A protein has these predicted regions:
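N-terminal, Lys/Arg-enriched amphipathic/low-complexity engagement segments
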Residues: 17-76
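Flexible, charged surface loops at secondary-structure boundaries
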Residues: 51-56, 96-100, 123-124, 214-218, ...
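Short, charged N-terminal beta->alpha structural module
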Residues: 25, 58-80, 229-238, 299-309
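Short helix-loop-beta junction
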Residues: 74-88, 239-250, 310-314
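Short hydrophobic beta-strand segments
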Residues: 58-63, 220-226, 291-295
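Glycine-rich phosphate-binding loops that contact phosphosugars or nucleotide phosphates
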Residues: 54-196, 297
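Active-site phosphate/pyrophosphate-binding segments
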Residues: 18, 22, 26-27, 37-49, ...
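Phosphate-moiety recognition in structured ligand-binding domains
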Residues: 1-40, 127-129, 133-148, 164, ...
Length: 361
């Protein structure tokens, strides 16, 4: 930051909007619209080709780089135990793929060799293929009209495309296994409510995304998950903070984060008393303390809370942890499914990354 730049206050609505020259807040707020676009395509019959009386042997998710890969990990973690067929996340189409399998291709690049190669293999071996990517170029040629297509309908940067991939995967799973009871409309409503809670006009004490920025301020940040789903979410948050806010944040399992936190406390790396009397002009910059944001689903909330109860530098973050205040909508406790909670937390982390970038000017 140079002398002409200044920090923007999180409650300065006009300053935040003026600093958002790239439209990042708007892009981060489109998750609900992206899900509705997928639901509309589903209603229009986009996935009729993959429906069938027989359940698939395996559902295979081949994701490109970034958010598509993360979405596959989240779907496998949350839906794997409920789906009639096992969900496999792979970098390419497996050699055993055949007519009994469903192949979902997800990404933002129709020229991606991994997606194109997987598409060609899936079509050649008779698998039911779903394309959740721009349907153009080599990817279109590889499928030759023999795939169900859920191409993106809204132009959104890949950083904010996680919820679209989640919705596409849920739609495909629902098509081959109607007993799952996937509700894309409820997911979209929840994401719209989250975006509204995190809007620039809401003050920090009623805004979950801004509150996260406050917690991360002047700290070394670790995003931690205690299961496969929240660990995938932590990695997404780490990636988004780096790509959007240029903020380095580690992503790891909760057990590793707690070990590091206790080790830092035992070493006395930051003495609270010394920090109180620290003079940066004489003593130099004070060392930043570690802040662990423990991401938790509702089902594991009480267990994770008990593990971190005695630690001051750990904050528990759940989808339903919404500050109370006038005009702030909150989700009914325990009413959201795991995939909905993950999507809500993903939007919260994405908007926090945007605010972190904007306040730095």
């Amino acid at each position: 930051m140079n002398a002409t730049q200044a920090m923007i206050d999180l409650d300065d609505t006009e300053g935040l909007l003026a600093a958002d020259r790239d439209g990042l807040l708007r892009a981060a707020s489109t998750a609900g619209a992206q899900v509705r676009a997928v639901a509309a395509a589903l209603d229009e019959g986009a996935l009729d080709a993959v429906r069938g009386d027989d359940r698939p042997r395996t559902v295979i998710w081949v994701g490109g780089r970034g958010t598509a890969e993360t979405a596959g990990a989240m779907l496998a973690a949350t839906m794997g135990s409920r789906a009639a067929a096992p969900i496999v996340v792979a970098a390419e189409a497996p050699s055993w793929i055949g007519p009994l399998d469903v192949l979902i291709l997800a990404g933002d690049d129709p020229d991606d060799p991994a997606l194109v190669g997987a598409a060609a293999s899936g079509v050649r071996r008779g698998a039911r293929v779903v394309v959740a990517a721009p349907y153009d170029g080599p990817l279109r040629e590889a499928t030759a009209g023999r795939a169900a297509v859920l191409a993106p309908r809204l132009p959104v940067p890949d950083e904010f495309g996680l919820c679209r991939y989640l919705a596409a995967g849920l739609a495909a799973l629902q098509s081959v296994d109607p007993k799952l009871g996937v509700d894309l409309a409820a997911l979209a409503d929840g994401l719209d409510a989250e975006a509204l809670r995190n809007s620039a006009g809401r003050e920090v004490f009623t805004n979950p995304a801004k509150a996260l920025v406050e917690r991360m301020s002047r700290r070394r940040v670790v995003l931690a998950g205690d299961c496969a789903a929240t660990l995938a979410l932590a990695r997404h948050g780490s990636s988004i903070l780096l790509r959007i806010a240029h903020q380095v944040a580690a992503a790891t399992g909760l057990a590793d984060a707690l070990v590091a936190l206790r080790a830092a406390a035992d070493s006395g790396s930051v003495d609270p008393v010394e920090a109180l009397f620290h003079d940066e002009e004489i003593d130099g910059p004070v060392a930043e303390r570690l802040r662990v944001l423990a991401l938790a689903l509702d089902a594991e909330h009480s267990v994770v809370a008990s593990r971190v109860a005695q630690l001051d530098d750990v904050d528990l973050v759940g989808a339903e942890d919404v500050p109370e205040g006038p005009g702030v909508s909150s989700a009914p406790v325990g009413a959201q499914r795991a995939e909905q909670q993950l999507a809500i937390l993903a939007v919260r982390l994405e908007m926090a990354a945007v605010y972190l970038r904007l306040v730095r000017g």
